[in-house]
Regions:
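Accessory beta-strand-rich segments of carbohydrate-active enzymes
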Residues: 7, 18-22, 44, 74, ...
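Beta-strand-rich binding/interaction modules
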Residues: 136-138, 219-239
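A short, compositionally biased
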Residues: 10-13, 130, 234-236
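Short, solvent-exposed loop/linker segments at the N-terminal edge
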Residues: 211-219
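Extended carbohydrate-recognition surfaces in non-catalytic/accessory domains of CAZymes
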Residues: 1-126, 186-189
Length: 239
């Protein structure tokens, strides 16, 4: 059999984690201080976003990971009136949210393994779920963001990688200050993360859709497939 041109790696181990801060820039590793967070001309995001940053004092964690579950129990500064639903109770009385900025932002770091031959290919990250607002950085550059605690998302990182043997640093800033549900929701990378490398001509994430139509005489299955060409040359392919 022919080997698949696509490689998928589960990013479960090797992560480092540290709490940031939702309102104190010093305790949030300088994030956003210089107002050039999204500058294209050069990376200027946060100290923790760069490969040279020393994260040896950070916690070692496995992903999936939820930092809220380890937080102490607490009441907010202004408890809910008795006649209204107690959202704090529904969320497990965890010390997270707008009343607890010191517990509501988390930073994750992970070095990525990149092969020199991947320069002509495409590499992206697949996140099955991060709670909640997630900023994805590669080598100090903001490459994507997602503002949902439950929707999966993908980020193409190909154009920000070092293919000459240098370090490639993945960094995530996750802000769980705002919730979505009436129930305990947690905080952090609570579902799987995958690193995918594929040929420049490939079926993108969610590029295959299967539908079935049934009737008295039987069923008809239809499959539609999207093909993306992220290379610089025209390509002829067969599906």
């Amino acid at each position: 059999p022919v080997a698949s041109p696509r490689r998928t790696r589960l990013l479960a181990s090797g992560w480092r984690f540290h709490l940031g801060h939702a309102s104190d820039v010093e305790r949030d590793f300088g994030f956003g201080r210089n107002q050039r967070t999204y500058a294209k001309a050069g990376a200027a995001t946060a100290d923790a976003a760069y490969a040279a940053f020393d994260d040896s004092a950070w916690d070692r964690v496995q992903v999936p990971h939820d930092w809220a579950v380890a937080l102490p129990f607490a009441q907010p500064a202004k408890p809910a009136p008795k006649e209204t639903a107690d959202a704090v109770a529904a969320h497990g009385f965890k010390a997270i949210g707008r009343d607890f900025p010191q517990h509501s932002v988390g930073w994750y770091r992970l070095p990525l393994a990149i092969e020199p031959g991947d320069r002509e290919r495409r590499t992206w990250l697949e996140f099955d779920g991060v709670f909640r607002d997630c900023l994805v950085l590669i080598n100090g550059y903001v490459v994507g963001r997602n503002e949902s605690g439950y929707a999966p998302f993908n980020v193409d990182i190909s154009d920000f990688l070092d293919y000459e043997g240098g370090p490639n640093q993945l960094c995530l800033r996750v802000d769980a200050s705002l919730g979505e549900g009436w129930f305990y929701e947690g905080a952090g990378i609570y579902r799987h993360v995958k690193q995918v490398t594929a040929h420049a001509v490939h079926v993108p994430p969610w590029g295959t859709f299967v539908r079935a139509e049934t009737g008295a005489a039987g069923a008809q299955v239809s499959i539609s497939t999207e093909v993306a060409n992220d290379g610089l040359a025209e390509a002829r392919v067969t599906i």
